[in-house]
Structures are given as C-alpha cells and as structure tokens.
C-alpha cells in the first residue's frame, strides 16, 4: 500500500506497510504458531485476509489546530498535530465528510481542545460507516455542553451537505486525559442506531458499543464461527463478551438456546434489536459482567464462546470453565498472547482448530479463532 503520510515520515501507525501482505501474513502466522508451540494443534486453517486499503469503517480523529483551520488526525508524542484525512485506510466515502466538517467546525464555533493549555471544547470526531447502505454515525466529543446550543443551531447546514449522516451525537468527556469518550451521550438526531448487515445478519451500531473496524474480514470471522458451530452437536450455548451479538446472532438457529452477555448496555440493546428482527425467540441478551455471570451459574451449556478484550478471559473464568467443563469452547481473540496464557489455564482441553484473521493489515496485530474440545 502506498501512503504519502508514511513516505513523508508524518505517520508511523502502519509499521509493516513496506512489507507485502503475504509476508505480513507469514510473520503473523509464525508469531501465532510460536505462542501455541506448547499445545498440539490438530488443524491449522489457512489465514484469512481482506483489502489492504480503504477497509476501515471507523475514523477516530483528534481535533487540533484553530477553529478557523482545524486539523483532523492525531497528536505526535511531542504534541505536534498531524492531519490524517488522506489516510489510505479510510474508504473514499470519508473524504467528503472530512471536507465538510472543517468549515462546519468554524461555523459552529467549536474551538479545538488544546491539550497543553487545557483549553478549548472539541476533542475528537468519531465517524462510523455502515457497509450495507453507506449510512454514517458522527459523534462530536466535547469537553462540556458549553457549545451545544451553537452546534445544534449550525447542524442543519451539515445535514444538508451530508445526508448520509443518519445518527449524530455529542459525547461529553470533561477529563483532561487521553480518554476517547465520556459517559454522557446527547443525541442530535431522532435515529439512535446505525443499521449494518453481515452475511444477511442485521447488526446495529450505537455510539458506545464496540464494533469491528474491518467489515470485510469481520464478515468472514463471523461466518467461520457459524460454520464451526453448525458442525458441533450443540443445542445450548453462551456468547460471553458478546458486544452487539455478532457471533451469537450468526451461530444461533431457531431451535438453539443462546445467552449473550456483555457489560455495555448500549451493545445489548443492539443485540436484542437484531434478535427480534431475525425472529430468534430463544436468544437472551443481558448487560452483565461476563465472568460474574458465568461463575454464578450452577451448570454450563455444551458450548461457551468467548470474545474478550485484549486482556483475555482471565484466571477466574478459566478456573470456572475447567471445573464445569463444557464440551466445547470457541475462543475469539484480538491478542493471541493472552489467549495462549488462558489456554494454559485450561489443561483439560485440546486445540482442535485454529484460524488467523488479518483484521489489522500493516501492523503486527491480528484476530484468531480457536476451537477447544474437552479431552
């Protein structure tokens, strides 16, 4: 992938950009095999990759510069701002949005937040696109509600320029720290969730719910999990750390009993909406801590699917699963290092199948799906 920002030394986020994709996949596969070297793996499936540019459905832009000439991008470690509107990871559809946002920031008087001086209002612009219909969700992250009335007043101009903006919100993040969002979300549109579709499964995106950033590869990840589950004698499963329900909604059949657990209420609202659309009445989604939910149960289903954050599922949940011994565990991980550590805590299981998904091209990161079977 060619990137003028990288070539000019202005951005180094894509550290592997000079390596061809096949070389990147080989290096990632070698890393994964090294992490799982102590465990016999019955089947290594071929790695899955997607487009090498224009694949991201989300932009997280630090706003800097001045109200008349805002920059959208990032801050270097020394505080120097860098405009990343031309980043080739973003689809072409993002360019007109960035182009309209810059004059809008001036129109609305949204002074960019200055980290060094701790002054200003507009901290971040968060943009998400639906791969199914091109609709977009735009979030303004502000330090306070001081400029909210001005933003509302100027908003009709932006909506006229960009009719693809279906959901627009203001998030209030008052803390002087590099935290992307605060707890308060103020909706400026009637529509509160963005509709998307993966493999004919409706998924909804709300402001404070996690959603995969590479739809092409995520679609294949969900479809693979569905195919693996369909090959197993399973009538009841848990989907822990379920997010908006991507895995569970793909894996469930009308006859299957499924419980999805996720701590974020916004994500659970999305999952419930999807289940209702699909007419899946035996699916239950609850906004709870996944570990606390599981360890409070006196029995387990045949299959437990886990998709934890980078820290992994942790020893308490591993100990519980070891004791309760569900027949199958499917582990989806964005950090193979913590997954390997967790598998070490599950000595009663063997690795049936592993597949790498290149969700993050040009970096050392990847997603991995692992099927564990009770010995």
From Swiss-Prot:
It comes from the Bacteria. One of its GO terms (biological process) is rRNA base methylation. It catalyses: uridine(747) in 23S rRNA + S-adenosyl-L-methionine = 5-methyluridine(747) in 23S rRNA + S-adenosyl-L-homocysteine + H(+). Pfam families: tRNA_U5-meth_tr. The active site is at residue 334. Its EC number is 2.1.1.189. One of its GO terms (molecular function) is rRNA (uridine-C5-)-methyltransferase activity. [4Fe-4S] cluster binds at residues 3, 11, 14, 87. Catalyzes the formation of 5-methyl-uridine at position 747 (m5U747) in 23S rRNA. This is 23S rRNA (uracil(747)-C(5))-methyltransferase RlmC. It comes from Escherichia coli O17:K52:H18 (strain UMN026 / ExPEC).
């Amino acid at each position: 992938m060619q990137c003028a920002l990288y070539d000019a030394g202005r951005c180094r986020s894509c550290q592997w950009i000079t390596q061809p994709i096949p070389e990147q996949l080989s290096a990632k596969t070698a890393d994964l095999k090294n992490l799982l070297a102590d465990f016999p793996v019955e089947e290594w499936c071929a790695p899955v990759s997607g487009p090498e540019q224009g694949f991201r459905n989300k932009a997280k832009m630090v706003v800097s510069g001045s109200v008349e000439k805002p920059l959208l991008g990032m801050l270097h470690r020394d505080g120097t701002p860098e405009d990343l509107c031309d980043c080739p990871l973003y689809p072409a559809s993002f360019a007109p949005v960035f182009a309209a946002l810059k004059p809008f920031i001036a129109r609305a008087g949204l002074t960019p937040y200055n980290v060094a001086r701790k002054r200003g209002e507009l901290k971040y612009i968060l943009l998400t696109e639906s791969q199914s219909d091109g609709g977009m969700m735009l979030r303004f992250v502000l330090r306070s509600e001081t400029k909210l009335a001005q933003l509302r007043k100027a908003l009709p101009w932006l909506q006229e320029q960009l009719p693809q903006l279906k959901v627009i919100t203001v998030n209030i993040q008052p803390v002087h720290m590099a935290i992307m969002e605060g707890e308060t979300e103020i909706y400026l549109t009637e529509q509160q969730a963005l509709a998307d579709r993966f493999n004919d499964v409706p998924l909804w995106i709300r402001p404070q719910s996690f959603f995969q950033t590479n739809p092409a590869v995520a679609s294949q990840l969900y479809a693979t999990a569905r195919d693996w589950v369909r090959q197993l004698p399973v009538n009841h499963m848990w989907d822990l750390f379920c997010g908006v329900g991507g895995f569970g909604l793909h894996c469930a059949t009308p006859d299957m009993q499924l419980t999805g657990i996720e701590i974020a209420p916004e994500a659970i609202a999305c999952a419930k909406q999807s289940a209702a659309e699909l007419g899946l009445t035996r699916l239950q989604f609850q906004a709870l801590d996944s570990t606390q939910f599981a360890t409070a149960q006196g029995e387990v289903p045949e299959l437990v699917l886990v998709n934890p954050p980078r820290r992994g599922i942790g020893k308490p949940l591993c100990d519980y699963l070891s004791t309760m011994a569900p027949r199958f565990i499917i582990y989806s991980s964005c950090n193979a290092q913590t997954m390997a550590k967790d598998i070490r805590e599950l000595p009663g299981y063997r690795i049936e199948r592993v597949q790498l998904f290149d969700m993050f091209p040009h970096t050392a990161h990847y997603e991995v799906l692992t099927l564990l079977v009770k010995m």
